Amino acid sequence: MAKEDTTQALYKEAFNLFDKDKDGKITIQELGIVMRSVGSNPTQQELKDIAKEIDDGSGLVDFSKFSSLMTRKMKYSDSEADIKQAFKVFDKKGNGYANIQDLKHTLTSIGEKLTKEEFDNMLKDAKTVDGQIHVDEFVRVIKSSKSFN
């Protein structure tokens, strides 16, 4: 069995354990428990963000959405460490924060450049403090940005 098939089987088994009425859906509240049971460890904020993204108003998640979410989350789990490592270059004080203007200059002028508009759009909903962004917020923004997917 291919790794993807094994992973999908694991997701399905965990999902089915919480699908008590066997209707192919779990509640948003159970989502974090199911995610943790397959090796993911989402924070409460991540769970809130995920719920906003995938809840169609019913408060339920079907297996297709769950599987897609987990596949995407696992795909980016390695890159999260890479993003955090790259962020350290900008974290001059070692306190987990970087200057947004330094990030903007680099991301719009080096490598696979973003336009200034793409950068501004990417950070428009980011939580910042005094022109600084925290590493965890930066990771969240990068992972959810269409510019990096």
UniProtKB/Swiss-Prot annotation:
The record's section on InterPro entries has:
CALM/Myosin/TropC-like, EF-hand-dom_pair, EF_Hand_1_Ca_BS, EF_hand_dom
Which SMART domains does the record associate with it?
EFh (SM00054)
Q: Name one GO molecular function term.
A: calcium ion binding
Cleavable signal peptide: none
Q: What keywords sit in the KW lines?
A: Calcium, Metal-binding, Repeat, Vacuole
Compartmental location: Contractile vacuole
Cystine residue pairs: none
* Residues annotated as binding Ca(2+): 19, 21, 23, 25, 30
GO-annotated biological processes: microtubule cytoskeleton organization
| Gene Ontology cellular component annotations, sorted alphabetically | contractile vacuole; cytoplasm
Q: Which PROSITE patterns match?
A: EF_HAND_1, EF_HAND_2
What Pfam families does UniProt report for this protein, alphabetically?
A: EF-hand_7 (PF13499)
Q: Where is the EF-hand domain?
A: 6-41, 42-76, 78-113, 113-148
**Cited Gene3D superfamilies:** EF-hand
Concerning SUPFAM superfamilies, the annotation shows:
EF-hand
Family, as annotated: Belongs to the calmodulin family.
Task: State its role.
Answer: Mediates the control of a large number of enzymes, ion channels and other proteins by Ca(2+) ions. Among the enzymes to be stimulated by the calmodulin-Ca(2+) complex are a number of protein kinases and phosphatases.
Name it. Answer: Calmodulin-like protein
* Organism for this UniProt entry: Dictyostelium discoideum (Social amoeba)
Identify the gene encoding this protein.
calB
